[in-house]
Amino acid sequence: MGEPAGVAGTMESPFSPGLFHRLDEDWDSALFAELGYFTDTDELQLEAANETYENNFDNLDFDLDLMPWESDIWDINNQICTVKDIKAEPQPLSPASSSYSVSSPRSVDSYSSTQHVPEELDLSSSSQMSPLSLYGENSNSLSSAEPLKEDKPVTGPRNKTENGLTPKKKIQVNSKPSIQPKPLLLPAAPKTQTNSSVPAKTIIIQTVPTLMPLAKQQPIISLQPAPTKGQTVLLSQPTVVQLQAPGVLPSAQPVLAVAGGVTQLPNHVVNVVPAPSANSPVNGKLSVTKPVLQSTMRNVGSDIAVLRRQQRMIKNRESACQSRKKKKEYMLGLEARLKAALSENEQLKKENGTLKRQLDEVVSENQRLKVPSPKRRVVCVMIVLAFIILNYGPMSMLEQDSRRMNPSVSPANQRRHLLGFSAKEAQDTSDGIIQKNSYRYDHSVSNDKALMVLTEEPLLYIPPPPCQPLINTTESLRLNHELRGWVHRHEVERTKSRRMTNNQQKTRILQGALEQGSNSQLMAVQYTETTSSISRNSGSELQVYYASPRSYQDFFEAIRRRGDTFYVVSFRRDHLLLPATTHNKTTRPKMSIVLPAININENVINGQDYEVMMQIDCQVMDTRILHIKSSSVPPYLRDQQRNQTNTFFGSPPAATEATHVVSTIPESLQ
C-alpha cells in the first residue's frame, strides 16, 4: 500500500455569499469534488486494485446536505458552485458484508453553531477498483474541459451510460442556514441491530476532532438513505457498523476514514444512489474531478481562516462588552456604597458632636457642684458652735449683766425677807424702792435666791421649751373641777350678799351646794345671771362684780387672755409673797397661790376661828410685765385700785380698814 495522504480541510460557512451560485453544475463533478475532499486517492486506488467483490449501489441513498465550496476550473471568477441534484452510479456492492466501525469527530469549538466536517475520507477495496475511486494528491495537473463535459452525458439525468444503465436516485445537496449546536454521539462499543422492523443495518457518523479509523472487515460499504433532518448519516449494511476508539487500521479492507476538521457541518442530507451494475465506467471520470477538489481546498482554507478571525473578533467584542458591563456594574455598586458610607459618616459626626457637647456640659456642671471637703467641715463646725452658744451663752451673759447692774444693792435686799404690812415699814420700803428705781422694779437676781421680778423684756429672749409631763387624765379633771368650784362659790357668795334679808334662801343654796359637792372639800355652786349690781356698802368680804361684757373686752385684750387658762387678777398690793428657798435648774419654778374661799360646811369648820382659803399649786410657764391702760380697767376696779394704792403707799387711815373685796367674773362672761 502507498503512504496515505489525507486531505485536511474544512468547509466554509453556509452563509457564504457564493453559496447560492451555479446551481446548475454537473452533479458528477460536484460528487467527485466532495469525495476528493474527504478521501485519499492513493488509498482508494490501492483498495480498488485488490477489490474482489462487486458492490450493488442500487439501494444506496446518501441523503446529506454538504457545504458548498469554490471551484477555479468551472468558474474563473472564483464563484462557489452549488449542486442541487447529483446522481452517483457506483458498482454493486458485495452481498457479504461485515460490521464496520465508524467514528465521527466531536465539535472542537464550543461557541460555534455548525458541525465540523471530516478532513479525510479513505475508501479501499481488496479485489477490484471501485467506481468511486479517486486520484491521490500526487497528480497536481488539472483535468481538461473535455472529460468534464463527457461526464455530463454519462451521469446526467438526460443521458444514458455506455452500458445502458440509468441512475435510480439523485444526490441532493441543499444548503440550509439552520445550525445545530449539539451533535449526537454514539458510544464506542459495537452494537448489532437485529430488529426485524428495520429493513437494513445502519450506523451514525458524527464529527470528532481527530481521525477515527474504521475496522475494515468487509470490502464494500453499503449506504442507505438517512432522515432528512438531523446530524446523522445512515449506512445500510447487513451488519451494524461499530464505533471504535481511534487507532491503527488493522486490515487492508476498504476503509472510510473521516478526519476531524474545523468547519462545522450543518444539517445537510446527501443521498447516494448505487448503480445497478458493476460495469459502470466511473473510474475514468473520477480521475478528472481530482484537480477540482485540490483547487478548492486552498480557497476553503483561506475562508476558514477568515471565518475564525471573524469569530475571534466577535468573541473578543463580546467579552469586552461583558467586561465593560461588569466593570460598570462594579463601579455603580462602589459609588452606592461610597454614598451610603459618606451619609453614615456625616450622621456619626453629628452624633459625636452632640455627645461631646453633652459631656462638656456634664463636666462643667460637676465642676460647679464640687465643693472642697475642708469647707464643708468648717461650716459644720461653725453650725455646732452656734447651737452651743445659743443654748448656754445667754443665761450666763444675763446673770453677769444683772450683777453688774446692781452693785450697790443693800444687804437687806439681798437677804430673804417677807413683805410686811405695817404702816411704817411699808412706807420706808416703798420710799426706798421708789427713789432708787424710780417707781419701777429692776431686773435683779439675788445670790440667796430671792424673788425675781422682771421689769423689762431682755434683748434676746428665748422662750423655754414647753413642759409636757405625763399627766393623769383623772387628775387633770379633778383640778379643773376644783378651780371651777372655787370661782362658782364666789358667785354664790355674791348671791347671798344680795339677799342678806332672806336667810332661808341662803340656807337652801348652801344645802344644794352640799348635796352636789359632798365628795369634795370645795364645792362648785351653780349660778344664774343677774343684772343687778351689788351695793358697795355690803358688809361681805367677797363681792362678785357683774358688768357688761363690753367693759371687759379691752381688759381681756390687754392681759392676752386665753380660753384654757384660769386668771386671778388683783389690784391690791398688800399680798404676802413667799420666795422659794431652793431652786432646781432642771425643772420649772413652782408657784402656789392661796386665796380666800367659801367654807363648804360651816358646821365642820368654825367660821370665827378659821379662815377658808383656796391654795392653787402650779408651775411657772412664763412671766412678763404688762402695761394696761387705765381706761381698759373696769370703773369699779379702777376706783378700788386707787383706794388700795393710797392705802398701801400712804399712812393708814384713821378709820377702820376698808373691807377686802374679791371680784369674780362669771363664767358666762368669760
Swiss-Prot record:
InterPro entries assigned: ATF_bZIP_TF, bZIP, bZIP_sf
Post-translational modification: During unfolded protein response, a fragment of approximately 50 kDa containing the cytoplasmic transcription factor domain is released by proteolysis. The cleavage seems to be performed sequentially by site-1 (MBTPS1, S1P) and site-2 (MBTPS2, S2P) proteases. N-glycosylated; in its luminal domain. The glycosylation status may serve as a sensor for ER homeostasis, resulting in ATF6 activation to trigger the unfolded protein response (UPR).
Consequence of substituting residue 419 to V: Reduces proteolytic cleavage
Membrane topology reported for the UniProt record: Single-pass type II membrane protein
Tissues where this protein is expressed: Ubiquitous.
Region (Interaction with THBS4): 468-589
Region annotated Disordered, chain positions: 91-183
Record topological domains on the Lumenal side: 399-670
Ranges where the record places region Transcription activation: 1-150
Main localization category: endoplasmic reticulum
Span of domain bZIP: 306-369
A GO term, aspect molecular function: transcription cis-regulatory region binding
Covalent cross-link Glycyl lysine isopeptide (Lys-Gly) (interchain with G-Cter in ubiquitin), where: 152
Cited PANTHER family: ATF6, ISOFORM C (PTHR46164), CYCLIC AMP-DEPENDENT TRANSCRIPTION FACTOR ATF-6 ALPHA (PTHR46164:SF1)
This protein's name: Cyclic AMP-dependent transcription factor ATF-6 alpha
Source organism of the structure: Homo sapiens (Human)
Lineage: Eukaryota, Metazoa, Chordata, Craniata, Vertebrata
Gene that this sequence comes from: ATF6
